[in-house]
Amino acid sequence: MQEPQAYLNGEFIPVSEAKLPIYDKGIVLGATVTEMTRTYHQIPFRLEAHVRRMFCSLRHASIEPVVSEEELVEISTELVAKNARLLPTDVELGLIHFSTAGKVPLYACRTLSEEESKPTLCAHTFPLDFSYYADAMRHGYHVVTPSIRHIPPQCLDSKMKYRSRLHWHIADSQTQLVDPDATSLLLDLQGNITECSGANFLLAKDGAIHSPTLRNILPGISRDVVIELACKLSIPFKEQDLQLYDVVNADEAFLSSTPFGICPATKVNGKLIGDGRPGSMWRRLADAWSELAGLDIVAQIAD
């Protein structure tokens, strides 16, 4: 069987050969900016937006891009096309980009050349396994607030998407002690809700969608799609500080994220949200997303 390709530092290579040296700053320091895009009908969805956000993250992290935005879009499109040819047409791909800040000469035990010192850039794909999200799409996520708090934007700006996620690992470990199938929803130091592990968190109340402010959440590409669809459906979208009080008293809640688009949340810390079932506003948004994607996003995952 032909092996999928990866892009690493200017070359398309077999994915099994895509390796980083142990002295790469992505490994030593966790100094890595990243993005994830997915396909619909094996075509990348909102690729340009993901690449644009990655370059904003690189700029803020003081990591010099080694290609232009346009070049990375072209590289990514070619990579997806190469690897999609190896799969059945009904299989979708996740596309990962990451760029590290380069190498640590001390750990390399030698002087690094100018070429070796450049930031690492990698892109790779994988078949999306929707079974991870199927039960949540049918019945809704259980979100749990662990003791770990969201990193304040004064320390790391939440608008930057990065790989230093030890706090999420610890948070998820705590959450899974409560419910192995739950996902973490972090509070900030003031007790405001922020975001989930890998997803934005949204509420529906009195006919409007309510979101935490952009002060301490990632401005998700999928969240942007929800805003667009809400505008199209004449649903008000409001940003404000929200607390657990607002979650338990919401009519509905949902998560937005690249792999699944929009997925209901029906429980928080063991309490039902609304009537404990996926709600009508989520359904309207999912139907509109399906129209945009050209396929039934709920059936693709839940069936």
What does each model-identified segment do?
Residues S184-L185, N192-L214, P219:
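Glycine- and Gly-Pro-enriched alpha-helical subdomains that act as flexible
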Residues S222-R223:
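Secondary-structure junction motif
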Residues M1-L185, L189-Q190, L218, E228-D303:
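Conserved alpha/beta cores of soluble small-molecule-handling proteins
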